[in-house]
């Protein structure tokens, strides 16, 4: 049997992390079995579905490299097919027309609630032989079995059973002629030959209804697996107040797709004690029976730790391709300065996100207007003039501009003046970067370049002289 899974988002907003994890699990299961992964857009909610949301979902999928083998299919383009199946069910007697008014249904609901009963349709039109005009408004309901129960073996939760008496005669076509969500899903899974439906636990109550419709159509019933929800670190359902929940917001915040994927796969699934997984390892090891039944808590610190790991573990040239976007957001002109791959090597240890990296690298490429006030007050004092003049002259004398030779020049200055490295290094750092913190000074000065470094030291010396004149 060829394994076929699907990811079927409703395009009413962005791709959130819960949806992305469901997509990832479906994708991994298909890849693990050499099967196919289908993308289906469930856009039957015409009022809330937007083209922007469809684009945002695909952007998120593409950024995570969760490529689909079939689709995207759109439910709104399949209405003829759904209606043909409904007409067939009406003929076969597995569905019926219901003419009950909203007022009657509301009164029925209130009566049932008052008795403490679960509100459900009472089947009046199911057994009615009244004649109605062809143009009289009606809905179409599925004639749900009235006896027995529906049992399915959830691949994550084990056997789940629903009594048919608890299930309603579901509306499958509205008065305006449009088919309903639960019905469209069934026909899609049948037509697309989906073998495994992996989705959120909020769909568990839909499953028995969908199974009954599939059986009425004499269609194969797929295997179901319902993934638990994701909570924030406070135990409440993950939402915007916990920070980013959209996949592309994580991109904007400077996360690598590898870090988010690795984090999401471990959010409810495990393979021994392993924390770091390549894409190939995820595919190789992923099984549904290792997915947890209990809710997962989203931990941003853990994601940040993973991101820092991947910034340093992945090839710098690759990380640089993702960094480029963030550099553009900061409007930094990188034509004069180190290659971005070299920048990744320079700043990788210090920066946990690419956004942080882009925001802290400007001095490598552009001259700064002024020194950081606190750093200048502390380190650009008259006592720093001599160390800066001596180190400037030694840097000027370098013919082979390497980080090693820069280091020798700084060391030689400290030796000559008989002071600690900090007495040379700190003023030099503020002079060339404008700030009190940077990567190792030798590689920083080397990356900034000889001409620019010497110009900046002269600027710092002028700053010191100006301060002296003011006192």
From Swiss-Prot:
GO terms for cellular component: cytosol. Its cofactor is Zn(2+). Its EC number is 6.1.1.17. ATP binds at residue 240. Zn(2+) binds at residues 98, 100, 125, 127. It catalyses: tRNA(Glu) + L-glutamate + ATP = L-glutamyl-tRNA(Glu) + AMP + diphosphate. It is found in: Cytoplasm. PROSITE patterns: AA_TRNA_LIGASE_I. A motif ('HIGH' region) lies at residues 9-19. GO terms for molecular function: ATP binding; glutamate-tRNA ligase activity; tRNA binding; zinc ion binding. InterPro entries: aa-tRNA-synth_I_cd-bd, aa-tRNA-synth_I_codon-bd_sub2, aa-tRNA-synth_I_CS, aa_tRNA-synth_I_cd-bd_sf, Glu-tRNA-ligase_bac/mito, Glu/Gln-tRNA-synth, Glu/Gln-tRNA-synth_Ib_cat-dom, GluQ/Sye. Binds 1 zinc ion per subunit. GO terms for biological process: glutamyl-tRNA aminoacylation. Coiled coil: none annotated. It comes from the Bacteria. Its main location: cytoplasm. It is an enzyme of class 6 (ligase). Keywords: Aminoacyl-tRNA synthetase, ATP-binding, Cytoplasm, Ligase, Metal-binding, Nucleotide-binding, Protein biosynthesis, Zinc. Monomer. HAMAP family: Glu_tRNA_synth_type1. This is Glutamate--tRNA ligase. The gene is gltX.
